[in-house]
Amino acid sequence: MKIDLNADLGEGCASDAELLTLVSSANIACGFHAGDAQTMQACVREAIKNGVAIGAHPSFPDRENFGRSAMQLPPETVYAQTLYQIGALATIARAQGGVMRHVKPHGMLYNQAAKEAQLADAIARAVYACDPALILVGLAGSELIRAGKQYGLTTREEVFADRGYQADGSLVPRSQPGALIENEEQALAQTLEMVQHGRVKSITGEWATVTAQTVCLHGDGEHALAFARRLRSTFAEKEIVVAA
């Protein structure tokens, strides 16, 4: 069995360099919620050094609230903003001899695109316009995954090690209790259940079906590095290969 392990980087966390030795894919902030040209260059350089797949992590224009503010923007605006961000990272990667491999939206852009078909379409269209060979990463079973497939893009369905799930397979909003899993044992058990058995127990006790092709590790968690190491060790014990 094989699984991709990804982390959001270039967001001002001190653990980026170490996380890049543990993950197989990096989602690099493109300036709209965090990061800038220099951090994008630095993350690309480290990703290349560690053989980690390079990905863009575009966001709504919301540095004030780290891309977590809900926005109702016209689809054409979202298309242009997404194309702008991923185009910048693709060029930075190419300038350093690397190749951008995937795109994963950030924060509220990701969450809204999971449920809003027009928004999902705008993102998928921007990814396709930039490079039809790019992989589009989205929440398992979401509108974003459906939109990507409609454009003929390769898609990758994502699950979260440290997020609570609702009965319909969507994430518990961060504003609600149960959104974040602080207990390492619980996060580890949830991850293995999703990867090995394709299901996750919701906060209300029901099982939701999920397709786990990539697991997100949040680099901003208090114990992110320790958990990442433990997850890698557990995957090795279960003969689960980590690869992009």
Curated annotation (Swiss-Prot):
Q: Could you name the domain of life of the organism this protein comes from?
A: Bacteria
Keyword entries, A-Z:
ATP-binding, Hydrolase, Nucleotide-binding
GO BP annotations listed: carbohydrate metabolic process
Check the record and name the Gene3D superfamilies matching this protein: Glycoside hydrolase/deacetylase (3.20.20.370)
Identify the EC number(s): 3.5.2.9
Q: Does the keyword Transmembrane apply?
A: no
Give the GO molecular function terms: 5-oxoprolinase (ATP-hydrolyzing) activity; ATP binding
Claim: ATP-binding is one of the keywords in the record: yes
Quote the InterPro entries the UniProt record gives. Answer: Glyco_hydro/deAcase_b/a-brl, LamB/YcsF/PxpA-like
Query: What is catalysed by this protein?
Result: 5-oxo-L-proline + ATP + 2 H2O = L-glutamate + ADP + phosphate + H(+)
* Function per UniProt: Catalyzes the cleavage of 5-oxoproline to form L-glutamate coupled to the hydrolysis of ATP to ADP and inorganic phosphate.
What does the record note on quaternary structure?
Forms a complex composed of PxpA, PxpB and PxpC.
Identify its protein family.
Answer: Belongs to the LamB/PxpA family.
Q: What is this protein called?
A: 5-oxoprolinase subunit A
Question: What organism is this sequence from?
Answer: Escherichia coli (strain ATCC 8739 / DSM 1576 / NBRC 3972 / NCIMB 8545 / WDCM 00012 / Crooks)
> What gene does the UniProt entry assign to this protein?
pxpA
